[in-house]
Amino acid sequence: MGNLRDIRRRIKSVKNTSQITRAMQMVASAKMRRAQDQAVKGRPYIRALAEVLYHLQDEIDTSNSPLMQTHGGADLVLLVNTDRGLCGGLNANLIKMVREQAPENAHYITIGRKLNAALAKLNERLEATWSLTDPLSLLELKPVFDFIVQKFKAEEYGRVFVAFSGFVNTMVQKPVFRQLLPIEPEPLMNMAKAGGSSLDGADAHKQFLLEPSPAALLDTILPLYVFHGLVQIVLEARASEHSARMVAMKGATENAKNIIGGLTLDYNKARQTQITNELLEITTAMRAME
């Protein structure tokens, strides 16, 4: 009976766990759909800004623009991770990529606190960290933007990189490491072309009427591009997080069902053995009484 009680206790425990993972799966699924929709809808906007900036480079000299200027200073890495776990290998893959690609002796700032302990173990210098609400409020990113831009303009940092989990689809999230500042021509071109826009040919520039002037537009659009680039990065990371969590919780729920099935089979076998032994005892006792 002790063995049967243990099996029943384990079945009950796994059922309780499966109810929790199932509830978390449903919550993550709802958040995932919203986050994926926001990430996908934000891509055309940032690509359009990249295309305008790319064309502006041919109209004026951008080398003196503060956000496109190359200068000395330390390297800064913005690490966009999660505040909570239970999202599969998302954060593990991200920190692995950072260890492989980040410059040596870089300084770090983070959005999300889950990987702060990992950075501490690696003896990395953490300058600041932020936690953002879900769904995202654009105003929450203003302090991050101000920190990066002010430090870069003051030449405390010569390069700013960003590491995040790029959203591909529900099953696939790809770690991404790229330069945020200074803004360079080739990444601008690649970003614009990602939207299916043609940047080649004599007619390419005829798509744009630049008012009031290319210089005024550049001063306005460059900060917009950096800020909304940050917004898009966070949206991509959120879509990746909720997708990974939904998949992880779905897998945990399915594993729980398999475990319950195996334990139920073990319980039935143990019960059958117990009944058989009891029948044998009764039969033996009856024969002894004859």
Curated annotation (Swiss-Prot):
UniProt subcellular location: Cell membrane
**Keywords assigned by UniProt, alphabetized:** ATP synthesis, Cell membrane, CF(1), Hydrogen ion transport, Ion transport, Membrane, Transport
Q: Could you list the residue ranges forming a coiled coil in this record?
A: none
Family matches, as SUPFAM superfamilies: ATP synthase (F1-ATPase), gamma subunit
What Gene3D superfamilies does the record tag this protein with? 3.40.1380.10, ATP synthase, gamma subunit, helix hairpin domain
So which domain of life are we looking at? Answer: Bacteria
InterPro entries per record: ATP_synth_F1_ATPase_gsu, ATP_synth_F1_gsu
Q: How does it assemble?
A: F-type ATPases have 2 components, CF(1) - the catalytic core - and CF(0) - the membrane proton channel. CF(1) has five subunits: alpha(3), beta(3), gamma(1), delta(1), epsilon(1). CF(0) has three main subunits: a, b and c.
Instruction: Name the job this protein performs.
Output: Produces ATP from ADP in the presence of a proton gradient across the membrane. The gamma chain is believed to be important in regulating ATPase activity and the flow of protons through the CF(0) complex.
Q: What is this protein called?
A: ATP synthase gamma chain
Organism per entry: Akkermansia muciniphila (strain ATCC BAA-835 / DSM 22959 / JCM 33894 / BCRC 81048 / CCUG 64013 / CIP 107961 / Muc)
